[in-house]
Amino acid sequence: MQQFNFFMNDVVQEARNDMVHAGYTELKTAEEVEEVLTQKGTTLVMVNSVCGCAGGIARPAAAYMKNYETQPDRFVTVFAGQDKEATARAREFFTGYGPSSPSFALLKDGQIQTMVERHEIEGHEPIEVVQKLEQAVDTYCK
């Protein structure tokens, strides 16, 4: 069992590293979420997870978005199942949407504008997720 825990810790850390190296700011507490998501401007939130579709589809799409011509003001991430209070607080901002991970939420002035939910990620190609994210930021971040 201890070996499994070590393995999972490595998986979690690698998933965190993927997002930090892509240029996203980790929000690990409810207070950090509150401080950032209530700011004026646009924020892309990536709800990270350890599932296969997060690693194979969502995180690569998230990384791509840092290079897209239209940019939100902030790129942040919370980690479902790991930073539970931060994730729960972030989800309170996602009114009208159920809990979903991995997922992306785009907020403007603290208000949810749109989401790309797990069902729009799982089983899709990364480029399809990128296109949904591009459409969202083109609509709300220009």
UniProtKB/Swiss-Prot annotation:
InterPro entries: BrxB/BrxA. It holds the Pfam family Disulph_isomer. It comes from the Bacteria. GO terms for biological process: cell redox homeostasis. Belongs to the bacilliredoxin family. This is Bacilliredoxin ABC2448. It comes from Shouchella clausii (strain KSM-K16).
